[in-house]
A protein has these predicted regions:
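Conserved Class I SAM-dependent methyltransferase catalytic core
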Residues: 241-297
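Conserved S-adenosyl-L-methionine
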Residues: 128-223, 228-230
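Generic structural signal for well-ordered alpha-helical scaffold segments
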Residues: 20, 145-149, 253
Length: 298
């Protein structure tokens, strides 16, 4: 029999899905007003969604900046608000958020992390790899988390952090992470996710190929690397572009501080002709403990 808490949570998710169906269009920008209101409420602010007409239900609705309402806005709220055009915080987006918030604000804090994870899950599953948001599936994150934990690292470097799926794993809560992420929109959502999980972590928005942090007192390299992403490396023949996967593995080989690595790479990394020297070096130095081939579609 379903208990009261479970029933409340289920009803909350139903209302959240209604809101998401109104917000989700073609990119993640449409979700930012919802993230903003949720984070503001979680921080204890009085969220103000007002109508610009004579009454609340006539005229265009508008989500007021917390800075105007309370005189202070946290760095996270400011980051969310400044990540998109102000027009996303008014009109239909504001109305959809208002409908959800007015019905469910009483339970937001109780299920806050579940709400954030659900929004990310729904959006990435709908938009797929074209969403522009990189998220490691829970099953893969837990599998890789097991191996990361087994390495007993002090500090982990993730050069392609995405939504920081490893950093929020409970079993890795005591391990320090150094994260780099190229996409600003992904970084913003990762910051929201980390905040919901209670994880204090600064993500560096940068290109890891230009600013490699693997030597920042890190002893473990862990990442889900973008498959087949080509780099323009002037030191190579332009007809044979270097892939990011090969670049990261090469940096691991060169590193004096990184003693272990847990990487998710494309299957072609094990057979490509133009990275044969990398695979040969890994074998000669006895750096490979295991290669696990995942089922198709995982």
């Amino acid at each position: 029999m379903m208990n009261v808490k479970e029933a409340i949570r289920n009803n909350l998710m139903v209302e959240l899905d209604k809101c998401l169906s109104s917000l989700i269009r073609y990119d993640v920008d449409s979700l930012m007003p919802l993230f903003y209101v949720l984070c503001a409420h979680h921080e204890g602010h009085l969220v103000s969604i007002v109508g610009e007409g004579k009454s609340l239900f006539h005229g265009k609705m508008h989500i007021q900046p917390i800075e105007i309402v309370d005189g202070y806005e946290s760095p996270l709220l400011k980051e969310i608000r400044n990540s998109v055009n102000p027009s996303f915080f008014e009109g239909q987006s504001a109305e959809a958020v208002f409908q959800f918030y007015s019905m469910c604000n009483e339970y937001i804090n109780e299920f806050y992390q579940d709400i954030i994870e659900h929004i990310i899950s729904v959006y990435t599953s709908n938009a797929g790899k074209y969403s522009g948001v990189s998220v490691t599936t829970q099953e893969i994150a837990q599998l890789m988390g097991y191996f990361i934990s087994d390495c007993a690292p002090r500090r982990v470097y993730d050069p392609c952090a995405g939504l920081c799926s490893f950093a929020i794993l409970p079993e890795l809560s005591k391990i320090e992470f150094v994260c780099s992420e190229l996409s600003n929109r992904t970084k913003v959502i990762a910051d929201i996710r980390l905040n919901a999980a209670g994880k204090q972590l600064e993500i560096n928005q940068e290109d890891c190929t230009f600013n490699w942090r693997g030597n920042s007192n890190c002893d473990c390299l862990a990442s889900e690397l973008p498959f087949g992403l080509r780099l323009n490396d002037r030191s190579l023949d332009e007809r044979r572009p270097l892939l990011l996967e090969d670049f990261v593995i090469g940096k691991f080989i060169e590193s004096e501080s990184l003693s272990s690595a847990v990487l998710l790479v494309s299957a072609s990394t094990c057979i490509r002709g133009n990275n044969k020297h990398i695979r040969k070096t890994l074998c000669e130095k006895n750096y490979v403990d295991a290669v696990i081939k995942l089922p198709r579609g995982v």
